From Swiss-Prot:
Tissues with expression: Expressed by the venom duct.
Disulfide bonds: C53-C68, C60-C72, C67-C77
One annotated Gene Ontology cellular component of this protein: extracellular region
Family: Belongs to the conotoxin O1 superfamily.
Span of the signal peptide: 1-22
Protein name: Delta-conotoxin-like TxMKLT1-0111
GO molecular function, one term: sodium channel inhibitor activity
Sorted UniProt keywords: Cleavage on pair of basic residues, Disulfide bond, Ion channel impairing toxin, Knottin, Neurotoxin, Secreted, Signal, Toxin, Voltage-gated sodium channel impairing toxin
Pfam family, one: Conotoxin
Protein localization: Secreted
UniProt source species: Conus textile (Cloth-of-gold cone)
Propeptide section residues: 23-49
Keyword Zinc-finger recorded: no
Protein purpose: Delta-conotoxins bind to site 6 of voltage-gated sodium channels (Nav) and inhibit the inactivation process.
C-alpha cells in the first residue's frame, strides 16, 4: 500500500516537473493549434498532402518503401 502511494506521488511529481520545466518558447501550443486550423482551412498547404513517392523504374529506399504504386525491390520501384 505504501509502495503504491509512493509510486503515485512520484508519477504526479514527475508530471508536474515536466510541465513546469518544459520550454514553451513562442507559445508553442497556440502556434500548433493555429497551424492545424490553417491546414484544415487550406488543405493544399498541409505537409501531409505532400507525397514524395517514386514512380515505377526509379531508385527507391528499401526502408521507407517510398514507391507510389508498387514495392521497392533491389532499390528500384516495381
Amino acid at each position: 500500500m505504501k509502495l503504491t502511494c509512493m509510486m503515485i506521488v512520484a508519477v504526479l511529481f514527475l508530471t508536474a516537473w515536466t510541465f513546469a520545466t518544459a520550454d514553451d518558447s513562442g507559445n508553442g501550443l497556440e502556434n500548433l493549434f493555429s497551424n492545424a486550423h490553417h491546414q484544415m482551412k487550406n488543405p493544399e498547404a498541409s505537409k501531409l498532402n505532400k507525397r514524395w513517392c517514386k514512380q515505377s523504374g526509379e531508385m527507391c529506399n528499401l526502408l521507407d518503401q517510398n514507391c507510389c504504386d508498387g514495392y521497392c525491390i533491389v532499390f528500384v520501384c516495381t
